[in-house]
Each structure stands twice: as structure tokens, then as C-alpha cells.
């Protein structure tokens, strides 16, 4: 747990409360009437991801938002969104909102806050000054991958794959081998993180240009759901924006494909 980062986020929330003249804690009401009243009074609206989201799991762990038993202690009254895109649009549409998203998905529709004076960027993640960072992983049943799935993974972890990952705003692995098109035909199925999905879609598109006979099916279901699907053999590959838990790692092999930051975001009208 990074204590300085925790203090920074708490300070950010307190500054927002002071700016609007009301200290409302870190929660909001879900009902339309209460949400409306909160907006009029300037209360903070905390936006969180759903249970099972890898981004939520990583955020709560890194920020120490856990109870004494180590369980997620996200406020029950926080508004829940089920994807990165919904989180962005929700914060964009509510000038009192505060939330968090994958750095690679960050756009100018919202504003990212500094933590400990460091902006969320590829450079600050690389040098370690921005503490909210987590891995992007793929996971699969070792020894059970189809040749097609193995070939797609070979592309993802190649120099060509790393270049795509870097271009999309993430930090790639240190790939050592180049990819040679296999010209295979078949289907590879993936499921999981809505944070990993955008870069995975770009990787899939570039891979299919090299291998026109291949079909890559990507389902955005959340990290935990994707991992469960892979464990059950329902998909070839899981996408996860968190590390695998012990029970998951006992059944699946995981590979890091990138490093990503988590940006704390507010509405662009916010003065911070």
C-alpha cells in the first residue's frame, strides 16, 4: 500500500469538498431525487466500477480501500458503472463526480488529477513517480491452447505487438523476437477486462491483416468473468487488468503484456 498516494487522493477529495462549500464524505445517493439534491448542493459523487472489475480490484488494493479483513471497502452508496466507457461518460456528465479509469483509455473529455505532484503518464509510470499502476495480463490453461491461440499470443508478445501497445499509450514488455505471419485460418476467443479490450482490439486488427484467415472474437466481460471463462474452457484466453488470485493462478498460466496506470478523474469543469 502506498501511503503517500492514499494521502494524495484523500486530499484531492477534501479540496473538492471545500471548493463547493460542503463536506460530503466519499459517497453519494443513487436515487434520482437525492442525486439531484447532491448536485445542487455540490456534494461529491463517487463513481466506482462493478465488483469483478480488474480496475476496481487494483484501485482498491493500491489505495488501501480495504476493510480489516482485506476485503473491498468501496462505499455502498457509490454509483456503480460496468465499463470504462460508462465511467468516462458518467464523470463527463456530472461536474461533481470523481472516478478512475485506465490511463490508456483516458481522453480529454475528463480531467485527470495529479497524485503526489505527478501526472498520470507513460513517463511517470516508467520512472515510478506515479504510483497507481498495474499490469495487463492474459491468462489461459497451460498446455491446452490451440495452435491459433498460441500464434496470436506470439504476435502480442512480439516486437510488433509491443510497438502497437506502446503506440496505444501503454508500456509494453521488452519483446525480443519479431513475428512472422503464420497464414493460419481459424478462430481465437478472448474474454475479460474492459480496460484491456481496447488495445486487444487494435492488436487483433493488425494480426488479422497479417493472417486474413483468422477470426479474433473479443468479449468485454470484466477481468474476473473473463478469468472464470478461461478456467471453464469457454474461451481460449482471458484478459485481466489485475494480477491473478491464488486460486486462479493454480488453474491458469498468466503473461504480462503491458503496464498501465489508473487515472483519478473529475469533470473538466472542476477547478482542480
Per-region residue spans from a language model:
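Sec-dependent bacterial lipoprotein signal peptides
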Residues: 1-24
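Exported/periplasmic ABC-transporter solute-binding proteins
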Residues: 8, 21-22, 26-272
Amino acid at each position: 500500500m502506498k501511503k503517500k498516494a492514499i494521502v494524495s487522493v484523500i486530499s484531492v477529495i477534501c479540496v473538492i469538498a471545500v471548493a463547493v462549500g460542503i463536506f460530503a464524505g466519499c459517497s453519494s445517493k443513487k436515487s434520482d431525487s437525492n442525486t439531484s439534491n447532491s448536485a445542487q448542493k455540490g456534494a461529491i459523487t463517487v463513481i466506482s466500477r462493478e465488483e469483478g472489475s480488474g480496475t476496481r480490484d487494483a484501485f482498491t488494493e493500491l489505495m488501501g480501500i480495504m476493510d480489516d479483513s482485506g476485503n473491498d471497502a468501496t462505499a455502498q452508496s457509490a454509483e456503480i458503472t460496468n465499463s470504462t466507457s460508462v465511467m468516462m461518460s458518467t464523470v463527463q456528465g456530472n461536474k461533481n463526480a470523481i472516478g478512475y479509469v485506465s490511463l490508456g483509455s483516458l481522453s480529454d473529455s475528463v480531467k485527470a488529477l495529479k497524485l503526489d505532484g505527478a501526472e498520470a503518464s507513460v513517463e511517470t509510470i516508467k520512472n515510478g513517480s506515479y504510483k497507481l499502476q498495474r499490469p495487463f495480463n492474459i491468462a489461459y490453461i497451460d498446455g491446452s491452447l490451440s495452435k491459433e491461440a498460441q500464434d496470436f499470443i506470439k504476435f502480442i508478445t512480439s516486437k510488433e505487438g509491443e510497438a502497437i501497445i506502446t503506440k496505444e499509450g501503454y508500456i509494453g514488455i521488452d519483446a525480443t523476437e519479431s513475428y512472422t505471419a503464420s497464414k493460419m485460418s481459424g478462430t481465437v476467443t478472448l474474454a475479460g477486462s474492459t480496460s484491456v479490450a481496447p488495445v486487444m482490439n487494435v492488436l487483433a486488427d493488425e494480426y488479422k491483416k497479417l493472417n486474413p484467415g483468422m477470426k479474433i472474437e473479443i468479449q468485454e466481460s470484466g477481468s474476473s468473468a473473463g478469468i472464470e471463462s478461461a478456467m471453464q474452457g469457454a474461451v481460449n484466453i482471458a484478459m485481466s487488468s489485475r494480477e491473478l488470485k491464488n486460486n486462479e493462478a493454480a488453474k491458469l498460466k498468466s503473461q504480462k503484456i503491458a503496464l498501465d496506470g489508473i487515472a483519478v478523474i473529475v469533470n473538466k469543469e472542476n477547478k482542480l
